[in-house]
């Protein structure tokens, strides 16, 4: 039987070679199951289970002009492997007149695999149009793509998928994958997972980008449920679509009726451990899930950003429509921005949503229709929400919904809307982390299940639930601020504060069914309120609980600017119980930096009201609260408004700030890094000057230049300073170019430019300075027998940019220029000259450097202004050096070095005058101290072959055992 098949294989191979393009080749290594459709029946008999896995080598360009010979059919039950030697292109095939699946490949049995066997192995599917499934590949079993350099599909059309299978579809260890402009008149614009059993679409260990762009799934009258998954669609319940350990993943401008990019209604869509940016941009759907429609969506352990931007759904879930959404253990930022849903859930529509931030997570400018949920809509029975700020903050800002009212209305700010009675709502923030709602949260359906804030169940060795949950009206524009609904969050559920801080600020209002505090603090800033949910509130609903409103840690929050508004706590028909003692909440410490508020007496009030009783028997207000940190000094004193002292239903608590008039500057704001940055320009000039002079050897016979020399190389330098108080570090790196012209046998002129980038900082200070400088230089060397005279002149312009990081919001930035000039004049004298091979000499130089920094003012909150400052230094280095030359007719090894001692005979250290204009406070800032004497060591080697040379040059300056500065350069040199 084996002999029969081999004979048939040869016949079919000849048939294919006649029928197809000459550039297309197939090499059968075992037996042939790659056949034209018309001969399929006779082959099935011979490719039974008696044979093992089929392997065929394939490459070339095959056109679809002959439709009967284009489709390759396989049916080996043990599987068929296509070995892709180099580039395989399958293009220009059209078969729309009859329904038939499988355009380029049709696999009837066993797994079909496409395996790259060369570093350039690739497959291209172009313009394959069929009336059936799988315009590229249709398989009754699994499909696999492995080890391909490229896998591309472009401009193809089918009833469903370019790749369609009734079993798993896997992509493993490929490099570049791109699927663009493909159409399915059914489901799955690119990939369709069919079958009666759950299957998996997997992308694993891809080395390059994965791109799905401009793919579509359209409605087909002949298919009951169509238009699903513009890029990928899974039909069967429990199917899985997973991207594991890949690099960049992009879904852009895909569209469908459901799931603009991915559809897997009753299955899982998961992104796990990918190292490149995961991006869903401008995908759209006529129904639900602008980017993704699935049962469960998970994105975990990503090490690069996740971005959902400008996705759109005509119904729900502008970005994601899923029963369950889980984001956790992602190490980079996550952004949901400018997504929209015409009905609800501008970014996410879900029943269960669990989000944990290990880096920042931001929902910004998402929009929903009248169902609400500008960012997130939670529906279904007993929805649940868990937001946890672990190592990053979570923020909702600028999200809106269009309320369903009879009157024409502007969009209303809304971050989250919980439509049904929730099973669970949890907010937890790690210490020094926060969850910030600049847009309200609405949960109107009543429930006895509490909203848990910083619950102890989140406590772990790595997580302390002592962070801040913020409801704020700070980012509203003026027109939006006038509508109180844009600042009001409502929970028709009990709210429990266990730990950390609940901050209601900048005119925000929090309305709750009941409130109980067992730990932590609740803070209200002027114009903000906490109220129980009653029929008298702006939003009508159930009467609030009669359980006492209990607060055992009350703080008054301060805004950045003075306010005459009071804050409120309204208990309605419930008793109000206060215990503990009051405090002031200003985590960013902006109040104490503001002269308008903190330099003068200031007062805040909080109104307490209850129709039952206000119990303050365990609430003490005697102890003042002083400012124990930097800023304007003073203390807060608490008292009851006199006419409310004995009132048991209405009280006003007053906090009065009494300043002392003293201002203490925060140590990290002194700005020592600014004058210290002049040493960065000094290092730039010094490095360029040394690099120029070191290429001028004293003896003309040692210099590989007759008339003209050109030098190009890389250069790097660093400088450190140490003291008992602080340490600074400066580094520079870049490129240099020099032209050397021999004017006479004893007179050499050189000139060039050096371009270097740099970084500098002072330890324990949050100021980081980046620099970019250019040096123009010129040098002259005159040899007068045993005496050599050298001079150099360098001029530099350095651009500096600084960011000052802060644990608070008051980051500042600055840009300024620094100018520098350096001149050197020196002489060396030969002590020993042995046949132009070895030379020992002594030297003495004078090096004068002047650096000027321009004045500048930071940008940001309460910026600092720094006056111009100067660094002047005159140094005299002396020492002993050597030169040697080993050469033959073609090669030469040249060396030069010295050991010296340098003494600064004049030094003006940089000191700058600084000022805080907002606080009318000024001081002086000093750079780090740099020693005025040090030892230097330098060595240079040049390896020359005829007119070409390679060089390496190293210079180190040290004091005792501590290095102060060092530089290293290397490059190429051509002399004529």
From Swiss-Prot:
Residues 671-976 form the Autotransporter domain. Transmembrane segments: none annotated. One of its GO terms (cellular component) is cell outer membrane. It is a peripheral membrane protein. Residues 1-50 form the signal peptide. Belongs to the PMP outer membrane protein family. This is Probable outer membrane protein PmpA. The gene is pmpA.
